[in-house]
Amino acid sequence: MRTPQLALLQVFFLVFPDGVRPQPSSSPSGAVPTSLELQRGTDGGTLQSPSEATATRPAVPGLPTVVPTLVTPSAPGNRTVDLFPVLPICVCDLTPGACDINCCCDRDCYLLHPRTVFSFCLPGSVRSSSWVCVDNSVIFRSNSPFPSRVFMDSNGIRQFCVHVNNSNLNYFQKLQKVNATNFQALAAEFGGESFTSTFQTQSPPSFYRAGDPILTYFPKWSVISLLRQPAGVGAGGLCAESNPAGFLESKSTTCTRFFKNLASSCTLDSALNAASYYNFTVLKVPRSMTDPQNMEFQVPVILTSQANAPLLAGNTCQNVVSQVTYEIETNGTFGIQKVSVSLGQTNLTVEPGASLQQHFILRFRAFQQSTAASLTSPRSGNPGYIVGKPLLALTDDISYSMTLLQSQGNGSCSVKRHEVQFGVNAISGCKLRLKKADCSHLQQEIYQTLHGRPRPEYVAIFGNADPAQKGGWTRILNRHCSISAINCTSCCLIPVSLEIQVLWAYVGLLSNPQAHVSGVRFLYQCQSIQDSQQVTEVSLTTLVNFVDITQKPQPPRGQPKMDWKWPFDFFPFKVAFSRGVFSQKCSVSPILILCLLLLGVLNLETM
């Protein structure tokens, strides 16, 4: 006997023949909906197609013909089911207080059925719907609590589809409101243990790692600080003092300083004083922080260039720092072993809005025990030059990159110079402010400005040239201005342009050519000025020109092949044809011979 509770079960009764399975679909795309064959069940709580209600279903083999009686509760009252309800967050509602066209979720449109008004709905303005469809012919009766429809697909087959509430397809959902009434319940469901921070004293690492800030120590004040490498920030490239130098990170930075009152900043600003860049020590390893006064862990900063204190002389601030170059030698986990610094200084004119461009260079290299060992420098190729790598120059067994002039923001010559890149033609220029001096000193100053300090004497033939091996370097040819070319005894001939001509070529195998320098020449162009002329500045130009003189060999060619062939009359059947036209005419025709043979046979038969 059935219990009353079983009568309350709501059944979704589907009859499927063998081998038929429902196919889920996110949307019945391509299917054109027919008239809405959706009917809410009456007291029976079933959804039935009108055409299927009157039709008599034939018996399906293998299935019982007697359908069990389904007892279901009454369906809820009749109400309109909105298959595309308005989203809680309308992403296309861009105009407050006005209706956005084709935005089906815009509440300002006041449309009950926006699909009937708009030609289409913008993406994200309607809920994405998920449908599960099967062939309509296999459905006998449906009392699904979800909305259902019958669609006609592109092949004309009716599909029975059930709309499933799939919240995963709709990403914009209303967040649950949290108030005093439901807070405890939500906290019990979603709450967890809070994280409490515990202060733990960590000992400094035993050695530097790449990128770690470098520690410094000021014995005079017993203060531990960091080695700074000011860098430019913003559109104007203002100097940021807080930029730390990273361990094993060789790089260069440039920044600009502006002074409201250079007369007072000349001697008070530590950034202009050379002593502020070497009056401290560097800690070998980070663990030296625990005992910074131990001289065993301190590395003094060695000054390798002449540096004078800033001095305000009249309207000029002399000996201000314009370039700082640190050379740091490291020895793996043993830390920093040696630190040296070289400074470049210049003079500034005290004027409103004065500025100074500073250049900071930081180089790391492996520590060498032997002082006689040559300084290692980066290669520009191995062995041949690589396009874009620096052109290597040599002066007094010191290898460095050849450079060109570089101008500051106001057009004056900067202490910083452009590197000459192999295979890249370049030109640069600037204005040099001249001091009152005799002609020889003026010429010497301009020559040094054009080719840089020190003056290049040799150029590396290959990119991996060793400074100790003179055979791997070629001497630079110089062509100075001819003094006899001018007919003026009271004139001074000064250089105004330097052209660096580099002849290079590819050598080696065609499959792996190597670029090498064949020769370099410095070509100066000069102009004469009167000694009586008060020239305050002169425009200088430097350019480099690479000329490819590669002579490519002839492409390889194979040996001539023998023309092997049989003689024309090799086959005996062609002997007659190989005797020429005359012999063919004199030969007996095969047809005539055949006729004679037939005539002889006939005569024999008649006898």
Swiss-Prot record:
Q: Which residues form the signal peptide?
A: 1-22
Biased composition regions of type Polar residues, renumbered to the chain? 45-54
Q: Which GO terms describe its cellular component?
A: ciliary membrane; nucleus
Q: Which Pfam families match?
A: TCTN_DUF1619
Q: How does it sit in the membrane?
A: Single-pass type I membrane protein
Q: Where is this region: Disordered?
A: 21-60
**Which residues does the annotation flag as glycosylated?**
N78, N179, N347
Keywords on record: Apoptosis, Ciliopathy, Cilium biogenesis/degradation, Disease variant, Glycoprotein, Joubert syndrome, Membrane, Signal, Transmembrane, Transmembrane helix
Annotated localization: Membrane
TM annotation in the entry: 582-602
Q: Which GO biological process entries does UniProt record here?
A: apoptotic process; cilium assembly; positive regulation of apoptotic process; smoothened signaling pathway
Residues in compartment: Extracellular: 23-581
Cytoplasmic membrane side: 603-607
Checking InterPro entries in the record gives: Tectonic (IPR040354), Tectonic_dom (IPR011677)
Q: Which domain of life is it from?
A: Eukaryota
Question: Does the keyword section mention rRNA-binding?
Answer: no
The associated disease is: Orofaciodigital syndrome 4: A form of orofaciodigital syndrome, a group of heterogeneous disorders characterized by malformations of the oral cavity, face and digits, and associated phenotypic abnormalities that lead to the delineation of various subtypes. OFD4 patients have tongue nodules, multiple frenulae, broad flat nose, hypertelorism, and short rib polydactyly with tibial dysplasia (Majewski syndrome). The presence of severe tibial aplasia differentiates OFD4 from OFD1.
Task: State the function annotated in the UniProt record.
Answer: Part of the tectonic-like complex which is required for tissue-specific ciliogenesis and may regulate ciliary membrane composition. May be involved in apoptosis regulation. Necessary for signal transduction through the sonic hedgehog (Shh) signaling pathway.
Q: How does it assemble?
A: Part of the tectonic-like complex (also named B9 complex).
Task: Report the sequence similarity comment from the record.
Answer: Belongs to the tectonic family.
Name it.
Tectonic-3
